[in-house]
Every structure is written in C-alpha cells, then in structure tokens.
Amino acid sequence: MAIRKLAPVTPGTRFASYAGFDEITKSTPEKSLLVPIKRTGGRNSTGRVTSRHMGGGHKRFYRIIDFKRNKDNVPAKVAAIEYDPNRSARIALLHYVDGEKRYILAPKNLKVGDRIESGEKVDIKVGNTMPLKNIPIGSDVHNIELKIGKGGQIARSAGAYAVLAAREGNYATLKMPSGEIRKVRIECRATIGVIGNAEHENISLGKAGRSRWLGIRPQTRGMAMNPVDHPMGGGEGKSKSGGGRKHPKSPWGQLAKGLKTRNKKKASTKLIVRGRKAK
C-alpha cells in the first residue's frame, strides 16, 4: 500500500497524506455482519465525561470481526478485502464452504481467492489459525489469544505482529509488538502472518478538521487551564512551581512521569519475562 500525498493547493492539503486503497476490492460492506454503534461522546450512563476528547465524527457501522477463528477444519475463500472505519487494519470477508460469511483481520499478502482454514493442525500459511503449540518457532503471528478460547487480543492493529520465540512446558514465549516478552499458554490460538496496512503510522492528518471527522476533539494542555480545572493549572505565566504543580500530573492528581501504576499482585505479572521498558 502506498501513501498518497496531496498537492499543496490549500493549507489543509499542504501536509495531508492519505492511505492508498489499492488493496480494497469491495466498497460496500456485508450487510449481515453490520451492527449500529451507539454514540457516547465519552460520557457514561450518568452523563459525566469518563473519556476525554471524544465526540462528533462521521457515522459508522460496526463490522463484526471473528477474533476467535473457531470454525475448525472448514475451508474458507477470501471473497473481498474491505476498509473498516473502526480500526487501522483492513478486513477480509470470508465465504466458508458451508455458506457462512465472516470478517477477519486482513494479514499482509492475503489476496482475493486465497483459501484459509482454522484448526489444530492446518497448513502453515498466511491467514491460517492454530494453537501456538503447532506453530513453528520464529514465526510471525497476530491476533493472539491470552486466554484459551477468548479470542485474539494482542497484535490486531495495522502492521502489528508478535514473534513466537520459544516453547517450554505448557507455555509459549512471545515477543510482543511493544518489546515485552511474555508467556502464553500453548493452547491459545494465533494467526500466521503480519497484519497488513503497515504504512498507516506514516499518515499525516494535515488539518484539525480531519481529527474531528474521526471523532477526536481538541486537547487542552493542563498548564493552560485554571487551578480548578487541572493540578497543573494557574500561576503567573508558564509557572511550574507551587500548588502541587512542581511535578507533572494527570487531571486527577496522579504523577504523570515515571510512577509505576501496575498492581504488583496482578496474577499475570509472573508471566511477563521482560517488561516493555526493560533495557
């Protein structure tokens, strides 16, 4: 996929770049796999803002994605590669031989007409899903389960993948996209290959309005606020001292730089071999 840069005809197009849609083969989604999305604007059921900087944006339908890939030993044909407004990756429409249709995350080099399958022992090819115990060491995998049967949770965004580094006993060792090395049960499933649309990270929005189309509202710096609105607000000029403003903080008073916030008693801590920030 190539990045399209626009001519600087207007200030908004001067720095804008767009994803190429060369790999997209179908413009209208599969109607049976769509559900409406209820807008929240970042508010919870009491009407209070719980997620800041959300609101507006273009209307969307949610595409139901098969993250579990649990339709074993039933071959499927890739019918189309589609755009999904809800994620950075492309999605692939599968037509199973028994007539069922499902969406999956589209890995790199998956093409219309390819045949893919899920199961305990299927071919080692891009798009096939199987337990980690049957995947060769050194393979690139995506859509990885952390709990058996729950569905993929790791490496699902554009260009993401993890590397199967080792297997020992009941656990496989994975190098995550963040650099973290952790253990996962060998019965957990993963899909062979790397998620496509890797150039997504190089896209420049070019103007504020494009963020608004995506449902992202403006962010105001804490230092630009009043003391009533933020722990870092107030003071004469660009003041950082006094009133709890000496150290950067979150809007709720939590130290923002360097403070470890992970619960030390979390059960999955023992499965992390090396943290993502370890040297």
Swiss-Prot record:
GO terms for cellular component: large ribosomal subunit. One of its GO terms (biological process) is cytoplasmic translation. One of its GO terms (molecular function) is structural constituent of ribosome. Residues 232-242 have a biased composition (Gly residues). Residues 259-279 have a biased composition (Basic residues). Part of the 50S ribosomal subunit. Forms a bridge to the 30S subunit in the 70S ribosome. This is Large ribosomal subunit protein uL2. The lineage of its organism: Bacteria, Pseudomonadati, Chlorobiota, Chlorobiia, Chlorobiales.
